[in-house]
Amino acid sequence: MATTESLTNGLRTLQAIAFDVDGVLTDGRLTWSPSGEELKTFSFTDIMGISLLRRLGLKMALISGEATPQVDLFAKKMHIPFVAKGTRDKATALREFAEKFGLQLDQICFFGDDVNDLFAMEIAGMSACPANAADEVVRYVSDRAKTGSGFVSTENGGIGAVRTFADAVLAARDQSGRDVFLMKAPE
């Protein structure tokens, strides 16, 4: 996806990002252990992308329709302070995130992959999705990309989609991953 001047400006001024979990931070597959525990796999490539975004000072949120303990565990590991899980109304959760951190909705990107994410995407200043998001979501985000407020990753959910977004934010801010990695992450 070509980075337009308006997208570059949007990525440069972005203050926060809210992620759906399943299909964005994971590959969307559901696996159970022999004891019946739900298992999720996260990519270290995406984990590094989140770490770089944190070091740039972006506020983070996880907003998931699933209410699994893995969401809390991931948030704790990544120092993500806002978690809304088991929610059908992701737009309301996004508004709560904005209010809690003193953000305007147009300062936030919502990164989702399926139709239940569209409601939050519609009120966010920017939306992003993995390459393998639902067709309706890819169309919506692609339409927003025409005005610089949408980002369709070249990678699939759970295997680099978030990292490509992080790399685009770094490029828009004339930052290298190496230099940002050396920065101290905000508490």
Regions of interest found by a model, annotated:
Residues V24-R55, S64-G65:
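A positional/architectural concept
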Residues G36-K40, K77-M78, F82-A84, A91-E187:
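Mg2+-dependent phosphoryl-transfer enzymes with acidic/Ser/Thr/Gly-rich catalytic loops
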Residues T13-Q15, L58, D106-Q107:
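Short coil/turn segments at beta-strand junctions that form active-site/ligand-binding loops
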